[in-house]
Amino acid sequence: MNTDVTEAEAAEQVVARFLCGYHKIWQNYFPGLNKRAHWHVMFSARCSPEEGISCRSLHRALYGLYGTDIRTCIERVRDCENDGFIQILDASGQPCTASPTSLIAATDKLHDSFDRHCRETIEALCKALGDREGGRSHGLDCDRAAISAILGFFNSYEQKWRETCELVVRNKGLTPAYANDAMDHLVTYQYWAIVMLLWSASPFGGSRADAPALVIDEINSRMWDALRLGHLAIKERVGNLIRWGFFAEQTIKKHKAVALTPLAGSAITESLAATKPLLYDLYIKLVPQEATA
């Protein structure tokens, strides 16, 4: 593997580019299904045996990770069903309505879309780490080992993101109730995407030292394709990020703007840089090293 490019580029920028690129890949194959729970439904269904995985088992995993209640879990399952990626079955294998006792099984559409997303992810990983021909030349398949490795990487990164959020929120001095509420929101994809937009546009993310803050309208415009959130919803989330210590409010030509706080910017940068070894470990697991020699 030629690492000249990645050695010249800061570790945090390599990781951030891969993470943001991955979410674009996901949105390409699973448009509109960008919530964390959607992601877990798809991974669980793709890895499940032919008879499927129980909705109750999926809920236990989501509750442990995000505190997701069973009603929300079932709503996310229905979203995936409505788009044709999963089918909901009873114990006898017959179609049924989603419930805690139902089973979730992958459709042919999910197998096709998921595996193409997986192969494109491996190509993006190789490119991020300087192996520009890796994913294409090695003819890699999306088997269970590959899926498990990808899932493990993102679970590990999510833990680092959670620790980063806890650091920033704790420094803000919120009451336990407000801090818990903040954490419930910050672990969602919507908040991560908005924060990463600000990080990428800041000096922390490699922009020039005098990079200006972003006005709310610009955040709304950039986030529409990824989040499909309206102006008021973006404004609400930005307001929360100000209250929780991630953003500092500014004014640019009489327009409200925000920039990352120094603490948040530094914490995110450190977390991303610490993820670089995990990204390389993922590459080792996914790409046969004899093929890269």
Predicted regions, residues:
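A short, conserved structural fragment
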Residues: E81-S92, I242-I252
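Short amphipathic alpha-helical interaction segments
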Residues: G67-N82, R228-R243
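Exposed, interaction-prone assembly regions rather than primary DNA-binding/catalytic cores
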Residues: K127-A193, L197, Q289-A293
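Short alpha-helical segments that sit at the start of domains
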Residues: V15-M42, C165-S200, G205
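Electrostatic interaction modules used in gene-expression and signaling proteins
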Residues: A193, L197-L198, F204-P212, Q250-I252, ...
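Short, amphipathic alpha-helical interaction segments positioned at domain boundaries
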Residues: D108-G134, G265-A293
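Short, cationic-aromatic polyanion-contact patches
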Residues: A91-H117, I252-T275
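Short acidic, hydrophobic short linear motifs in intrinsically disordered regions
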Residues: E50-G64, G205-R222
